[in-house]
Amino acid sequence: MARPRLDLTRAQVLAFRQHVGALDVRLPPGPHSLRQAAWAGLQDSMPRAALLSIHARVEGTKPDTWADPSLVQLWGPRFSTYVVAEQDRAVFSLGRLPDDGDSRRAAEDLAARLVAFLDGRTMTYGEVGRGLVVHPNQLRYAAPTGTVLIRWEGARQPTIRAVPRPMVDPRDARLELVRRYLHVFGPATADSFASWAGIRPAHARATVDALIESLTPMRTPIGDAWILTEDEPAFRIAHSGATAARLLPSGDAYYLLQGSDRELLVPDPGRRAELWTSRVWPGAVLVDGEVVGTWRRAGPDVVIQAWHRLSAGDRAAIEAEAASFPLPDVQGGIRVRWDGRHGSARQATKRPEIDRAATSRTIPNRGPGRIPTNSARKSSSPIAAAPTTDRKPGPSSRSPAAGCL
């Protein structure tokens, strides 16, 4: 890697990721904003995770927003369930098509058999597995051909349907997938891209090398990494502070991290173990740009485990965020429970705080409130125009989900 051009602080990295991830100011409703919210895909491996990720980024989100005609569901990075923009289907499918001949032929052959068997029908993946005499979980290996879409709502088996293959060169799709990753998760490395995308490290490194002329090396507290050169100015300016509170669902892109990137987001190793568990991850509580705890939901009950004592204002903001969840299965309002007592005298001096024993409070489900947003701007993409926001950064002194669903 070339000599880094800029030393980035932790605050700069997190502020940039929050800004490009639309976690500082919610976007206005509409397909353009949905595509931007899903710029690196929305993992939907837990029921309604993608919906709550959209809610954290787009105002006016409704219970059926995840099923908007502009969005589709597929097996994407790491063969996990993802919601992506229909016009970006090639990026998240063909962008992961294996490079080696044997693996690619296996994917193409399975996809051809699947398409022929479906013959225009939509069927459960169990039915398709029995029809093709393969384990249903193997069907996801056909997804990188771009010809397979799924529909999964959490309660039943996913259904599968075949669609025409996108008219995009897989190499171009792979390059765009790297660009998406570096824009949302940057600064990042080829190896971290490989881990996120679920492809071989050697293939990831080759793709990054192909983009080297459009990348800039940066030094971060966890090591040297790449950013898109076009993103460099955004790292040098002070972004507006993060909105008061966001409740990010299990697997949300903001903390869908591995290795040292987790250390950057959550420096305390004990807290990292609470967020990135060995089983289903809880959701992350984001307040003023910092992860301050975890949350889980069961029906109307949202249980919040804070990592230190919070101010009355922070608590109110978190409860209001929970109350606005656009969930179809909540009748009579969300009930928030604060789990345990947290914070030390040293932590309590950071801001006016209150002591929190385990308490619960029922909040009417008012649905998503409208939050002021700014206008949208356009950016270029080799495959399709990239929607990004024209949220002019302003000066700020701030640095920058049983499952939770």
Predicted regions and their residues:
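Low-acidity, Ser/Thr- and Arg-rich intrinsically disordered low-complexity segments
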Residues: R356-T362, R366, R370-P382, A386-C404
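Phosphate-backbone binding and catalysis cores of DNA-processing enzymes
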Residues: M1-G131
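A short, conserved structural fragment
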Residues: S70-S80, T145-E153, E213-T220
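Glycine-rich, small/acidic residue-mixed loop/short-helix segments
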Residues: A273-R351, D355
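Short, leucine-enriched amphipathic alpha-helices that occur as contiguous helical runs
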Residues: A107-V115, R171-V178, R315
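Non-catalytic regulatory appendages
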Residues: S214-G270
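Loop-centered beta-sheet repeat module
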Residues: L139-L211
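Short amphipathic alpha-helical interaction segments
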Residues: G60-D68, L132-Y141, P201-T207
